[in-house]
């Protein structure tokens, strides 16, 4: 029985890795071994940063809400507590959007939170 070296399958596998490494600098897009290492590392970075992105956006929203809340004489934590007491359930993404694009609506929410905190 003749020896099978798996030429077609191996070549396809290597071509797939080199295609994924397109745009990498230097030998990282030319040499299979180096390209494979970089593709694996890139996959790890992508996996990690898809989760990191969620944390980064939440931090950005909180920063924007805090800045707008302080313009109304409240801290972020007191604003959120006041909104919870008044039964207003608006998520941080929407609050941050209001703080940037519709400050009057945000000010109304802040006033409602203040009213609950002063009770």
From Swiss-Prot:
- Enumerate the GO terms in the molecular function aspect: rRNA binding; structural constituent of ribosome
What are the alphabetically sorted keywords of the record? Ribonucleoprotein, Ribosomal protein, RNA-binding, rRNA-binding
The record's annotation in SUPFAM superfamilies points to: Ribosomal protein L20
UniProt-listed InterPro entries: Ribosomal_bL20, RIBOSOMAL_L20_CS, Ribosomal_protein_bL20_C
Question: Among its keywords, does the record have rRNA-binding?
Answer: yes
**Disulfides per UniProt:** none
* GO BP annotations listed: ribosomal large subunit assembly; translation
The keyword rRNA-binding appears for this protein:
yes
What's in the GO CC field?
Answer: ribonucleoprotein complex; ribosome
Q: NCBIfam families, alphabetically? A: rplT_bact
- Please state which protein family the record places this protein in: Belongs to the bacterial ribosomal protein bL20 family.
Function, as annotated, reads:
Binds directly to 23S ribosomal RNA and is necessary for the in vitro assembly process of the 50S ribosomal subunit. It is not involved in the protein synthesizing functions of that subunit.
The record's PANTHER family line, in alphabetical order, gives: 39S RIBOSOMAL PROTEIN L20
- Its protein name is Large ribosomal subunit protein bL20
